[in-house]
Regions:
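Basic-flanked hydrophobic alpha-helices used for secretion and membrane insertion
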Residues: 313, 320-325, 331-551
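Hydrophobic alpha-helical segments
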Residues: 112-256
Length: 662
């Protein structure tokens, strides 16, 4: 009997090839992408790249997500195949095959299927390994090299990972067969889904969950809070989506059914009845499509925005070729430090700037009345932050004259409470706003770390910086010095001396010999190399994660159409016999498919719209400061996804119609 199962295993794969083709394609892509991620993560060449540790850590995270997503996709595809083969397995049982024989047969099927698909996936991954590595180098703006990257341990690791996944499939298949008799197996596919319970309660809980998730996304004020609440909001939205699809669609269809004018139309009656019949299955499938579609949109929008913003972000943190910041030092020290380093290396200084400024955080705010944190006070969540510059430094940065005296100040404000106001109060000191600036005047002159931490930052320009400080002896206001220079050396030359510059700063610190006095700095070209590695890696991961999520989306849609086509075929045959013509059948099919498969897309766009504010704040920490660019990128990704979704819909609905009209 067990010899018979060997023959049956092979013949079943051939006979059910229409079910196994998309399953094989999903496994093939999952294995290929997983192999490529593992190969890049363990590639010793990446460790040699400037910033290689960061990119390997980023790829490691992507590797984990890809593995998890691949496992879920393979599990879903296997579940669909087994559900659609349940009648076949039941008939085998009725013909005399025992459960152990059925388990043995399905085990052998998966062994053959797994060897072919996993082997092919590893082969394709190894074939494109060099090309993908070169693509990653290109994204990281490094010299592209086609070098051998084959690693035996990567092949073994992928085999172990997918071996465990397929062992899980074998266990689940055996469990399915063991808990059902032959009659139950033969009827499993044809049995309708159970009507959901507590639908009003589910609808209320789903609405509340989705509402709270949207509220968190819309009301978050700063990037740090956005990071901490992001996953909570995501879980709430996912939970709410599943509940609303499960209960909301049922309630909606029941309302349509009660509307006699609408329901008792041939096309409407058939569509609504079919959806109600398979309510639970439709709900889970549709919610899954909505969530996967949202993942594609968010991942690609974020990754593309990060990649496009890399150049502007570099200049925000590194406005000069060589920069140095210090505390408790003098402007003359920084000026001398930069000049000496340039002289030692034989560089000609094209431009050099040295500034002193202060910064402070606001503990409480009532309109234009602000209270600065006191020294030693815990500054967990400031209301807003200020950078304060001397009038002379403002004039040097902008080339524009500014006449301030007494308590007059110039103001650049992002905080809504002080923007476009004539005066503001800091502690008990009132200042008159003589001039408000609309342009961020420190760009290309002084690095602004607050730009990436909060959207709520401000600049003050005062007549005399020291006189301003003397008014707040007990407040936590911090002195900062910055110096920067641009030189006539090429980027390649500057990159060679990047480590020397770091050592030069360390040597300078050792000479200070005073506690609390120190300097730190970086070179633009070195920071750019590390940022390019990070941003290019993130974009690379975003592309491949989007591919995985898209494969999952297509798989769910395709299998859903195929399974519903087989389930609907017999009912449409009956309807044809009672007088429904081909035109009415086509109209009914189109209405049902349109209703079912464009609802998830609508939810995906809705989720993205509500998540956009929170996403933009999170991306700001990573360096996406150009909001206009991000909006254009997001809308472009949505347009591309819409086109892809419509194409998928057209292809899968054609398969559905062919099955129904057979």
């Amino acid at each position: 009997m067990f010899r018979l199962t060997n023959k049956l295993a092979v013949s079943n794969l051939i006979k059910n090839r229409k079910l196994y083709y998309p399953f094989a394609l999903a496994v093939l892509l999952a294995v290929t992408v997983t192999y490529l991620f593992y190969s890049l993560t363990f590639n010793p060449k990446i460790a040699e790249i400037r910033g290689g540790t960061t990119i390997q850590a980023t790829l490691g995270f992507g590797m984990f997500v890809v593995t998890l997503a691949s496992a879920i996709i393979v599990l879903y595809a296997n579940s669909f195949v087994m559900k659609n083969r349940s009648k076949e397995l039941g008939i085998y049982g009725m013909l005399g095959l025992e459960k152990r024989h059925l388990i043995s047969m399905t085990f052998k099927e998966l062994v053959v299927f797994g060897i072919l698909t996993v082997g092919a996936g590893i082969g394709i991954g190894a074939l494109f390994d060099k090309l993908i590595f070169a693509f990653l180098l290109k994204l990281m703006k490094l010299k592209v090299e086609l070098v051998a990257t084959f690693q035996t341990k990567v092949v073994i690791t992928v085999l172990v990972v997918f071996g465990l996944i397929f062992l899980g499939l074998m266990f689940l298949n055996a469990l399915r067969i063991a808990r059902m008799n032959a009659l139950q197996l033969s009827r499993e596919k044809a049995s309708g889904e159970k009507k959901g319970r507590f639908l009003p309660l589910q609808t209320i809980l789903g609405s509340i969950s989705l509402g709270i998730g949207y509220y968190l996304a819309l009301t978050v004020k700063d990037p740090l809070t956005a990071l901490t609440t992001f996953f909570i909001a995501v879980l709430l939205v996912i939970f709410g989506t599943y509940l609303l699809f499960n209960a909301g669609i049922t309630v909606f269809l029941q309302i349509l059914k009660k509307n006699k004018k609408y329901y008792y139309q041939p096309n409407n009656l058939i569509s609504v009845s079919n959806l109600i019949f398979r309510m639970k299955k439709n709900a889970v499938g549709l919610a899954t499509i909505a969530i996967l579609s949202t993942m594609v949109l968010v991942t690609m929008s974020a990754a593309t925005s990060i990649f496009n913003s890399s150049e502007s972000f570099k200049k925000v943190l590194n406005p000069h070729d060589f920069g140095v910041s210090g505390q408790n030092v003098e402007k003359e020290d920084l000026d001398k430090l930069l000049s000496q380093f340039a002289s030692d290396k034989g560089y000609k200084i094209k431009e050099k700037e040295v500034f002193r400024y202060t910064y402070f955080a606001v503990a409480n705010q009532e309109g234009t009345k602000l209270t600065i944190f006191e020294k030693g006070q815990n500054r967990v969540q400031p209301k807003t932050v200020f950078m304060v510059f001397d009038q002379k430094d403002y004039e040097n940065m902008t080339g524009q004259k500014l006449s301030l005296s007494g308590n007059e100040v110039g103001l650049f404000a992002k905080n809504e409470g002080v923007k476009e106001q004539k005066a503001l109060t800091l502690n008990d000191h009132q200042f008159s706003v003589k001039e408000e600036f609309t342009k961020d005047f420190i760009v290309n002159h002084v690095p602004n770390q607050f730009n990436i931490l909060t959207a709520d930052y401000n600049y003050l320009v005062v007549p005399d910086l020291q006189a301003f400080l003397d008014q707040f002896p007990d407040s936590a206001i911090y002195n900062q010095f910055y110096g920067g220079m641009n030189v006539n050396a090429s980027e390649a030359e500057q990159l060679k001396v990047a480590e020397e510059y770091e050592k030069y700063l360390q040597k300078f610190n050792a000479q200070l010999n005073t506690e609390g006095n120190y300097v730190y700095g970086s070179t633009l070209v070195d920071a750019s190399a590390q940022m390019s590695a990070l941003f290019g890696g993130v974009f690379f991961i975003g592309i491949f994660l989007s591919i995985i999520f898209m494969v999952g989306t297509v798989l769910v849609i395709y299998y859903k159409q195929i399974s519903e086509g087989y389930e609907d075929r017999e009912r449409f045959i009956i309807l044809q016999k009672v007088g429904l013509d081909q035109k009415q059948i086509k109209q009914t099919i189109n209405k049902q498919v349109l209703t079912v498969f464009f609802l998830p897309l609508l939810f995906a766009f809705l989720h993205l719209a509500f998540a956009y504010h929170m996403l933009s704040l999170i991306l700001k920490v990573i360096g996406v400061l150009d909001t206009t660019m991000m909006l254009i990128v997001t809308l472009s990704i949505c347009a591309i996804f819409l086109i892809a979704y419509v194409l998928i819909f057209m292809i899968t609905s054609r398969s559905y119609r062919k099955i129904v009209q057979m």
